[in-house]
From Swiss-Prot:
Glycosylated residue positions: 109, 151, 298, 308, 370, 387, 487, 558
Lineage: Eukaryota, Fungi, Dikarya, Basidiomycota, Ustilaginomycotina
Transmembrane segments: none
SUPFAM superfamilies referenced in this protein's UniProt entry, alphabetically: alpha/beta-Hydrolases
Signal sequence extent: 1-21
Assembly, per entry: Monomer.
Family that this chain belongs to: Belongs to the type-B carboxylesterase/lipase family.
Reactions catalysed: chlorogenate + H2O = L-quinate + (E)-caffeate + H(+)
Record-level Gene Ontology MF annotations: chlorogenate hydrolase activity
Descriptive protein name: Chlorogenic acid esterase
Keyword annotations from UniProtKB, A to Z: Disulfide bond, Glycoprotein, Hydrolase, Secreted, Signal
E.C. no: 3.1.1.42
Length: 585
C-alpha cells in the first residue's frame, strides 16, 4: 500500500508499537475470586493477573463521560459515582480506542466512547505501598494513537527486579478532529474547544490524582512519559495555564517532542478555518450552524472525511491536512505562543528528561523534491505561518543553513560500533532510491530540526536559563543507536524517529537490541521516576543540561557525554524572536 508523504507522519509515529500489542491482547482474565479488584467511587474494578511477568493489569477503566452527542468537540466531563454499590467494571480487556484514520489492529474496537486508561502494577501491590507512578501519553501526530499498542510489562517487571517498583498508567485521549478541531465557530462557542485532546489528558491526570492511591500508587510522585506527539503533549501541558500544572504531576520524560508540534496556529487562522469548513462540507453540512450539524453527523463519516483531507495534502507539508488537527493557541489552555510566554517564565518548574533521535526527519522527508527550487517551494508552504517584514530574510537563512550539500543532510554521519551500524554521508551508500536524492537529505535535516530538535532546545533553554523562576534540573540526550539486523546492516534511515521505543516497550521487530543500552535506558527512567535523577540507579555519568548544554549520547558501547552544539546557527535561525513569529513558534 503506497502512503502519501504526509500520512507517513501518522504511520511512523504509531507503527513503532503495532507489534507490541500482541503479547498484551493474549492475556486471559482470571474469572475466579483471585482476580485483582480495586474499589472506586465509580464501581469495583476487576482486572487480571499476569503470572508471566508477575503483574496485575486493569484495562479500559473509564475516566470521563463518553464524549458523544452534544459532548462531541467539548471538554471532557468527569464521571459521577456508581449507581449501585454492586457496580463492577470489567477491566480484563482493552477499552475502545479513539476515532482515527485506521485501527492499529482488527482486535481493537474504535469509537468515540474511548476516554479510558490502563493501570499496570506489580503483583500484590496494595494501597499502603504508595509506589511512584509513571503515566504514558501516546504519540501519533495528534491524528492516530492508542494505549493497547504500548506493552509496559517488561518496564514494570524491570522496576521490580531492581527493587524500585512502579505503577504504570496509560491515558487514552481524542485525536484528529474529535480532539483538535479549530474554526471560528469552535472558538466562539461556549460548548466546544479546539484542544479537547489536551483537556482529556488533564482530566485523566485528575482521575489519577483522585484514584491511583487505591491501586497502590502515590499521587504525589507522578511522572509523565511520552514520545513524539505524546512528548509534545507533555511539553504543552507544562506550558498550559501559564505553566500551572495544579500539582497533577511532578516530573516529565519527553522523547522526540518539544514545546510545539511544528507551527502553532490559532483557531481562526485561515488554514484552520478552511479545514473546519471542508470537514463540515464533506459530511453534508453547508448552512446554519456547522458545529451543530457536525455533532449530529455519523462519527465514522466525520473520520473518513478528515482522513481524506489529510491524504489530499499529498506531498506538500503541511496545508491543509497536516495542520488541520493539531493543538492550537486557544488563549485559554494555551494562553499564547511559546516565543511570547517562555521568556516570562511561564513553564512548569519540574525535573525533566528530554531528548531526540539523531535522524528525526528521515521518516517524514520529502521524496519528490528534485531541485533546490522544489525544496524552497516546499519550505515556503511548510513553514511560513505569518507573513511579516522578516519572512523573506528568515527563509533565505533557512536555504543558506540547510544547503544543497548531501554531506550535511540526514541521515547524518554516524560511526559504526560493535552493536551500532554505520551511516555514511556518501549518497552512493544509500540502497533505497529515494534516499539517494540531495533534496531528500536536505529536507530530512530541515524537518527534523524544525519539528523536533529546535523545539527541544527551545524548551531546554526556557527550563535552564531560569527565566524568573525555573530551578528544577533537566537532562537531555541524543539517541544514536542504529540497531543491526541479523545481516549486520542497520536502518537506512539512521537512528530514526521512534527507533528508541523498543528500548522501553516490548516490540519484537527482527533487530538486535544492544544489551547494555537495553538495561541502561529503562534503569535511568526508573531512577528518574524515583529520585528525579536518572543517574542514581544507572551507575554512569549524565550531567544535567545546564549552562554547559551537555547531552548523553545514547549509543550502545559508545554512550558518552557530548555538547549540544550541532547545527546551532541553523536552529537559532528557526527560533530567534523574529523567525519564531514567521514560523508560528
Amino acid at each position: 500500500m503506497r502512503l502519501p508523504n504526509l500520512t507517513l507522519l501518522v504511520w511512523a509515529a504509531t507503527s513503532v508499537g503495532l507489534v507490541s500489542a500482541l503479547p498484551q491482547v493474549s492475556y486471559k482474565a482470571d474469572a475466579t475470586a483471585s482476580a485483582p479488584t480495586v474499589k472506586l467511587h465509580q464501581g469495583t474494578v476487576r482486572g487480571l493477573a499476569d503470572d508471566n511477568y508477575g503483574l496485575e493489569q486493569f484495562f479500559g477503566i473509564p475516566y470521563a463521560k463518553p464524549p458523544v452527542g452534544s459532548l462531541r468537540f467539548a471538554k471532557p466531563q468527569p464521571l459521577g459515582p456508581a449507581s449501585s454499590h454492586k457496580t463492577v467494571i470489567d477491566a480484563t480487556r482493552f477499552g475502545d480506542i479513539c476515532m482515527q484514520t485506521v485501527a492499529p489492529s482488527p482486535l481493537y474496537n474504535m469509537s468515540e466512547d474511548c476516554l479510558n486508561l490502563n493501570v499496570v502494577r506489580p503483583k500484590g501491590t496494595t494501597a499502603k505501598d504508595k509506589l511512584p507512578v509513571l503515566v504514558w501519553i501516546y504519540g501519533g501526530a495528534f491524528r492516530q494513537g492508542s494505549t493497547p499498542i504500548y506493552n509496559a510489562s517488561e518496564l514494570v517487571q524491570k522496576s521490580v527486579e531492581i527493587g524500585k517498583p512502579i505503577v504504570f498508567v496509560a491515558i487514552s485521549y481524542r485525536v484528529g478532529p474529535f480532539g483538535f478541531i479549530g474554526g471560528s465557530e469552535i472558538a466562539d462557542s461556549d460548548s466546544a474547544t479546539s484542544n479537547a485532546g489536551l483537556y482529556d489528558q488533564r482530566l485523566g491526570l485528575k482521575w489519577i490524582r483522585h484514584n491511583i492511591g487505591k491501586f497502590g500508587g502515590d499521587k504525589n510522585r507522578v511522572t509523565l512519559f511520552g514520545q513524539s506527539a505524546g512528548a509534545m503533549s507533555i511539553a504543552l501541558q507544562n506550558f498550559a495555564y501559564d505553566g500551572n500544572n495544579h500539582g497533577l504531576w511532578h516530573a516529565a520524560i519527553m522523547n522526540s517532542g518539544g514545546i510545539a508540534p511544528g507551527p502553532l496556529l490559532t483557531p481562526k487562522h485561515p488554514t484552520v478555518e478552511q479545514s473546519f469548513k471542508r470537514l463540515a462540507n464533506g459530511v453534508g453540512c453547508t448552512g446554519g450552524s456547522l458545529l451543530r450539524c457536525l455533532r449530529k453527523a455519523n462519527a465514522s463519516e466525520v473520520q473518513t472525511v478528515a482522513s481524506n483531507l489529510t491524504a489530499q495534502a499529498g506531498g506538500t507539508f503541511p496545508i491543509p491536512g497536516a495542520l488541520a488537527w493539531l493543538p492550537l493557541v486557544d488563549y485559554e489552555l494555551i494562553t499564547n505562543y511559546p516565543s511570547v510566554n517562555l521568556p516570562q517564565g511561564k513553564l512548569a518548574d519540574i525535573p525533566v528528561i528530554q531528548g531526540n533521535a539523531l535522524d528525526e526527519g528521515t521518516s517524514f522527508a520529502q521524496k519528490q523534491l528534485n531541485s533546490s527550487a522544489d525544496f524552497e517551494r516546499w519550505v515556503r508552504s511548510a513553514a511560513v505561518i505569518h507573513n511579516t517584514s522578516y519572512t523573506e530574510q528568515a527563509l533565505q537563512k533557512v536555504f543558506e543553513l540547510y544547503p544543497d550539500v548531501p554531506e550535511q543532510g540526514s541521515p547524518f554521519y554516524n560511526a559504526e560500533t560493535a552493536t551500532s551500524a554505520a551511516t555514511t554521508s556518501d549518497l552512493n551508500s544509500r540502497q533505497y532510491p529515494p534516499l539517494t536524492s540531495n533534496q531528500y537529505k536536505r529536507s530530512a535535516a530541515f524537518f527534523g530540526d524544525f519539528t523536533f530538535q529546535a523545539q527541544r532546545r527551545t524548551y531546554l533553554k526556557a527550563a535552564t536559563l531560569g527565566w524568573k523562576k525555573n530551578k528544577a534540573k533537566v537532562w537531555s540526550y541524543e539517541f544514536q543507536q542504529n540497531d543491526k539486523f541479523a545481516n549486520g546492516t542497520g536502518s537506512l534511515l539512521g537512528p530514526y524517529h521512534g527507533a528508541d521505543v523498543k528500548y522501553y516497550f516490548i516490540r519484537p521487530d527482527g533487530r538486535q537490541k544492544d544489551p547494555v543500552l537495553a538495561d541502561r535506558m529503562p534503569r535511568a527512567y526508573i531512577s528518574f521516576v524515583y529520585h528525579h535523577d536518572p543517574t542514581v540507579l544507572g551507575g554512569f555519568e549524565w550531567p544535567p543540561y545546564g549552562k554547559g548544554k551537555k547531552l548523553l549520547q545514547m549509543k550502545g558501547d559508545n554512550t558518552t557525554v557530548i555538547e549540544d552544539a550541532y547545527r546551532k546557527e541553523a536552529m537559532d535561525a528557526l527560533t530567534n524572536r523574529k523567525a519564531a513569529k514567521v514560523f508560528g513558534f
